Amino acid sequence: MNCIIKTESEIKKMKVSGKIAAEVLEMIENYIKPNISTEEINNICHNFIIKKKAVSACLGYHGFPKSICISVNDVVCHGIPNKNQILKSGDIVNIDVTIIKKNYHADTSKMFLVGQTNILSQRLCKIAQESLYKSLNILKPGIPLYKIGEVIQNYVENNNFSVVKEYCGHGIGRAFHEEPYVLHYKNKSHVILEKGMIFTIEPMINAGSHEVKCMKDGWTVKTKDHSLSAQYEHTVLITENGCDILTWQKNEKIPSKFINK
């Protein structure tokens, strides 16, 4: 596997891209309420990205028709914003943003709870986010890549949820998708983490079975059993002693139990 080690100049540019991607999610939070359409959310994000003098990486990517992915309830990933899809109280929503600034990509996503949600929805989103945080906690040079999937799967299954296996994290830089490919379940990858690697970790967690199906539009992926699904994603840089989260949000805080002392 040919993993690209980023130069200091490239890392500097990707930090700028990561900051913008994070700002999109920070900005859109106040708009996630009942009675807004997913297309309106898309348009608000698109305009914000343009104001930042960046470009949506999703728009036109292999024919994808919108600027961001919005996945609601049993949609696992790649949901297409639609003027007829109106959010309602009780929905859980993933917004996935990938931007390009000065030729360098950054990719991030998070869950939003709409109005009054039930305990299952809240717990699913919590465990999905915590599984990402647990994986971030182990990152440093010399760690085998497969450890990421091992940590995520163990945590998720110990909490009685399942990990989607068809989609994975990925290297990122000048290209949207680069090596290495980051599996979120137990695997036998021989890749060893090195300083200067940049990739995404983006576990997709289902309340029921891990099985998924792709819809006729060729993009939208749903759980086969119609159970809820949740995902969180960050773009991370491997540093000399750990990692730097390039898409960190200002209001984000990792619980102390997930931080090495």
Swiss-Prot record:
Reported cofactor(s)? Co(2+); Zn(2+); Mn(2+); Fe(2+)
EC number from the UniProt entry: 3.4.11.18
Q: Where does substrate bind?
A: 78, 177
Q: Where does a divalent metal cation 2 bind?
A: 107, 170, 202, 233
Q: Which CDD domains match?
A: MetAP1
Which UniProt keywords are given for this protein, alphabetically ordered?
Aminopeptidase, Hydrolase, Metal-binding, Protease
PROSITE patterns annotated for this entry? MAP_1
Keyword flag Protease: yes
- Give the domain of life: Bacteria
Q: Which InterPro entries match?
A: Creatinase/aminopeptidase-like (IPR036005), Pept_M24 (IPR000994), Pept_M24_MAP (IPR001714), Pept_M24A_MAP1 (IPR002467)
Question: A GO molecular function for this record?
Answer: metalloaminopeptidase activity
Tell me how the cofactor is bound.
Binds 2 divalent metal cations per subunit. Has a high-affinity and a low affinity metal-binding site. The true nature of the physiological cofactor is under debate. The enzyme is active with cobalt, zinc, manganese or divalent iron ions. Most likely, methionine aminopeptidases function as mononuclear Fe(2+)-metalloproteases under physiological conditions, and the catalytically relevant metal-binding site has been assigned to the histidine-containing high-affinity site.
Any one GO BP annotation for this protein? proteolysis
The UniProt catalytic activity note for this protein reads: Release of N-terminal amino acids, preferentially methionine, from peptides and arylamides
Q: Which GO terms describe its cellular component?
A: cytosol
The similarity annotation says:
Belongs to the peptidase M24A family. Methionine aminopeptidase type 1 subfamily.
Q: Which HAMAP family match?
A: MetAP_1
**Its biological purpose:** Removes the N-terminal methionine from nascent proteins. The N-terminal methionine is often cleaved when the second residue in the primary sequence is small and uncharged (Met-Ala-, Cys, Gly, Pro, Ser, Thr, or Val). Requires deformylation of the N(alpha)-formylated initiator methionine before it can be hydrolyzed.
Q: How does it assemble?
A: Monomer.
This chain belongs to the protein called Methionine aminopeptidase
